[in-house]
Amino acid sequence: PFRTAILRGEPRSGKSLLGRWFAHAGLGETIDPADAMEETALFHRWNRAQEEGTALLLIPEKAPWEIALPDLRSRLGAALALEIGQPDDDMMRDLIVSHAARRGLMLGEDALTYVVPRMTRSFAAAERFVAVLDRLALERQARPTRNLCRDALETLYGPDQGRLL
């Protein structure tokens, strides 16, 4: 019955991007970060959205979202809960390829097959890995090979990470 959803996910998972798309497509209003908004103001915005028939997408920055105002807490408890989960191997691969392409890096299949199972499963980790890989490639004037990927993993996670598995 309520036209409100709460979208959660880890940092760098694309929550804000989805919220902008939602609003720009005219699907409703996005409040991001919703947990930074004063609770009484958010309560009134929620009520106004229901009265106007406007969909509302709330994106809290922190989890759990502690709500002190009882009326707001009960209303948000009835909202649709959406969550962007941790990326699986296929998503990690796609994230690495995407971040690398934006930096002009082309990773070969051998490098990707090596890196993906050794990575921490998070959107931010994929971004950090490619940033380190890009820096190492520039410093060494080298292509992003399997060996350079191993060095990037070791830079991020320590000297044994590149040898795991």
Language-model segments: which ranges?
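Short conserved motifs of the RecA-like P-loop NTPase core
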Residues: M106-M119
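Conserved C-terminal helix/linker of AAA+ ATPases
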Residues: A137-L156
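Conserved AAA+ ATPase "sensor/coupling" helix adjacent to the nucleotide-binding pocket
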Residues: R75, A79, R93-M106
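Conserved P-loop NTPase "ATPase switch" module shared by AAA+ and STAND
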Residues: A25-A41, R45-R48, E52-K62
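Conserved AAA+ ATPase "SRH/arginine-finger" region at the nucleotide-binding site
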Residues: A79-M91
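Walker A/P-loop nucleotide-binding motif
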Residues: T4-L18
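The conserved phosphate-sensing helix
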Residues: M119-A131
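Short regulatory helix/loop adjacent to the ATP-binding pocket of P-loop NTPases
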Residues: P64-G77
